[in-house]
A protein has these predicted regions:
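N-terminal beta-alpha lobe that positions the nucleotide/phosphoryl donor
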Residues: 1-263, 267-291, 295
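Catalytic cores of soluble metabolic enzymes centered on carboxylation/carboxyl-transfer
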Residues: 299-302, 307-462
């Protein structure tokens, strides 16, 4: 049995893991940089260990310091959260070599999915649909998308529409990939013009059994980075959703996946009108990648399925079996990421004088329709420049999608946020569009969307 968990992370995700551990009677250990010493996650842990310095390379990316902290504080397991070392197979191996429990997939699974080129080959062998293009790229293959094999988040990614631009764009993508990931390997695949981003949550026991907890729609993106996530994917027909779930299950089972993971797909709604009735046509969806960790957007799945994904991670890490969920989808959940950033999406820093978002729950389930807020900050905290600028995830859960949207807009309008500029108004504008309300968006929709001006809450203006 796990008795004490060190979370090799910071902020909101550390608090999220601590919340499940407290409920289960498991003690917790935080590691923190100097800049993070005053943040809530440090105070909430049973034990806190300083990692001298501020830059990630000095602190949260120093695997040897984190393992030493776990040994020194008597932790018997390490949870990586997301980002930092969460998908570093060598760190996972080092954790296990130190005699500690790694709350995550086997290092071999991380390796298998770490390279997009190798992952696509493995998924094709498992019978999961993938995007392919001829090599070399022919005149009839355009438009195409150049992608970094080792990365994500839009870095090392270029859309090419003309053959004469291919070499130059490939060189730019390779340079971006080297800068961001230390690996300039890129590959080319067809570019789907009107696509949606749909992902499936899986939890595996490491022995081939895999539970599927439905799909999430992460189509609203900015520069290939997710802005809004929701579950279930309302625009996906039931037969396509079932096919996505089965493809994700096969993907995870093929690598004997252990723990929580997400299989991401590109969904092409236009392919449905071109296919024949009576089944899901070829080309309806394609494998993109598998994230071998807990996702930022996991709360929407937890709310509609009534499940604690961190608890399941802990259960699998302890070697316990998985039980099928008692119920299916209940209602609709939508999550927005509240960032300290200006209208040009430039990260902001400074003292967060006030952060007051009315919530019915934090880091856990909702008893009824309402708002959940998962945040790494509180009023009075300092927002620094060393890490991601996300202040909070604001999640709405309701019986219907329209009610969830209304609740979320109201919560954002009524939120009191002072001291740093945020994207709060931008989020309200997106949620208030007719396109979003009708669920008629694509992965590039936000680039040209006609956004209405955010309407302030009159009670706050008075």
């Amino acid at each position: 049995m796990i008795t004490r968990v060190l979370v090799a992370n910071r902020g909101e995700i550390a608090r999220r893991v601590f919340a499940s551990c407290r409920r289960l009677g498991i003690e917790t250990v935080a590691v923190h940089s100097d800049a993070d010493a005053g943040l809530p996650f440090v105070a909430e842990a049973d034990v806190a260990v300083r990692l001298p310095g501020n830059a990630p390379s000095e602190t949260y990316l120093r695997g040897e310091l984190i393992i030493a902290a776990a040994k020194r504080t008597g932790a018997d397991a390490i949870h990586p959260g997301y980002g930092f070392l969460s998908e570093n197979a060598d760190f996972a191996r080092d954790v296990e070599a130190a005699g500690l429990i790694w709350i995550g997939p086997a290092p071999e699974s991380i390796d298998a999915m770490g390279s997009k080129i190798e992952a696509k080959a493995a998924m094709e062998a498992a019978g999961v649909p993938i995007l392919t293009v001829s090599d070399p790229v022919g005149p009839g293959d355009f438009p195409v998308l150049i992608k970094a094999s080792a990365g994500g988040g839009g870095r090392g990614m270029r859309i090419v529409r003309r053959a004469e631009d291919l070499d130059a764009e490939r060189a730019i993508a390779e340079a971006e990939a080297v800068s961001a990931f230390g690996d300039g390997t890129v590959f080319v695949e067809p570019y789907v013009e009107r696509s949606r981003h749909v992902e499936v949550q899986v939890v595996g026991d490491g022995r081939g059994d895999v539970l599927v907890f439905g799909e999430r729609d992460c189509t609203v993106q900015r520069r290939h980075q997710k802005v809004i996530e929701e579950a279930p994917a309302a625009s996906v027909p039931a037969d396509v959703a079932a096919a996505l779930h089965e493809a994700a299950r096969k993907a995870a089972a093929s690598i004997s996946y252990r723990g929580a993971g997400t299989v991401e797909f590109l969904y092409d709604p236009d392919a449905l009108s071109e296919g024949s009735p009576g089944g899901v046509p070829p080309g309806a969806f394609f494998f993109l990648e598998m994230n071998t960790r807990l996702q930022v957007e996991h709360p929407v799945t937890e709310l509609v399925h009534g499940v604690d994904l961190v608890e399941l991670q802990l259960a699998v890490a302890e070697g316990r079996g998985l039980e099928s969920p008692a119920s299916g989808v209940n209602g609709h959940a939508i999550e927005v990421r509240l960032y300290a950033e200006d209208e040009t999406w430039t990260p902001q820093s400074g003292r967060l004088i006030t952060l007051d978002i009315r919530a019915d729950a934090a880091f856990g389930p909702l008893a009824r329709a309402g708002i959940r807020v998962d945040s790494g900050f509180e009023s009075g905290n300092e927002v620094g420049t060393h890490y991601d600028a996300m202040l909070a995830k604001v999640i709405s859960w309701a019986p219907t999608r329209q009610q969830a949207i209304r609740q979320l807009v109201t919560a954002l309008r009524r939120a009191r946020i002072h001291g740093v500029v945020t994207n709060r108004d931008h989020l309200i504008e997106i949620l208030s569009t007719a396109d979003f309300g009708a669920d008629e968006v694509t992965t590039t929709w936000l680039e040209s969307a006609d956004l209405p001006a955010a309407v302030p809450d009159v009670r706050l203006a008075a």
